[in-house]
A protein has these predicted regions:
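C-terminal end-helix/capping segment
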Residues: 173-194
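GST-like domain detector, emphasizing the conserved glutathione-binding G-site
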Residues: 1-119
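GST-like fold's C-terminal all-alpha helical module
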Residues: 97-180
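Short, hydrophobic secondary-structure boundary micro-motifs
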Residues: 77-82, 147, 171, 192-196
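Carbohydrate-binding/catalytic loop surfaces
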Residues: 199-201
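Non-transmembrane alpha-helical segments in soluble domains
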Residues: 67, 71, 91, 132, ...
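Residue-level signal for nonpolar/aromatic packing positions in well-ordered secondary structure
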Residues: 52, 135, 153, 185-188
């Protein structure tokens, strides 16, 4: 298998963390984005990461689809358990973490490229604060705990992405449980090996 990624993408990082947690043999190829000459384009004309090429040439993109495929490639505990209450709990937590990541990634892009008026930016911050407050309460109540799973990986990648690449929003303020969650998960070897470069916004 071959995984195309960009070091600044939190979505690609989610998959790179999963590869390491599952101890899978995957070749990683770093590519450029927003580049008409990117080596990614023959594999994914949309130019998005992560993109996974299977051994038979099949192409998968979107991090959740790639996670689901990787989970079929090992015999251990699943990152996406699909049976019983644990499966639905994991999917619920995963959905909340992805919604959080998506919301702040849009805000981050708007700040970076100056695409929105101040009023829109203010609305994005309010949405991010609401989501972070809900996640703080969820973590305080015992969510995103236990053996590593996809929901924890996505939430950890999201929080560290914001900490390293979105400096205008201090999500840690008043959210000790989220802060502790990130400190703990960031210490895992899979996270330490895939740290994103910093970006000052």
């Amino acid at each position: 298998m071959k995984l195309f990624f960009a070091s600044g993408s939190p979505y690609a990082r989610i998959v790179r963390v999963a590869v390491r947690e599952l101890a899978l043999d995957v070749e990683e190829v770093e590519v450029t984005l927003r580049d008409p000459n990117s080596s990614l384009l023959p594999y994914n004309p949309g130019g998005k990461v992560p993109t996974l090429q299977l051994d038979d040439g099949t192409i998968l993109n979107e991090s959740l689809l790639v996670l689901a495929y990787l989970d079929t490639q090992h015999g251990g505990r699943k990152l996406l358990p699909m049976d019983g209450a644990d499966g639905w709990r994991t999917l619920s937590e995963l959905g909340r973490a992805y919604a959080f990541l998506d919301a702040v990634t849009v805000w981050n892009r708007e700040l970076r490229f100056g695409q929105s008026a101040p009023g829109v930016i203010a609305l994005e911050k309010q949405r991010a604060d609401r989501a972070a407050d809900a996640l703080e309460a969820a973590v305080a109540g015992g969510a995103y705990s236990g053996p590593i799973d996809a929901g924890q990986i996505v939430l950890g990648a999201a929080l560290e992405n914001f900490a390293r690449r979105h400096k205008v929003w201090d999500w840690r303020m008043g959210r000790p449980h989220l802060s502790r969650f990130l400190d703990d998960i960031a210490a895992r070897p899979s996270f330490a090996a895939t740290v994103q470069p910093e970006l000052n916004l």
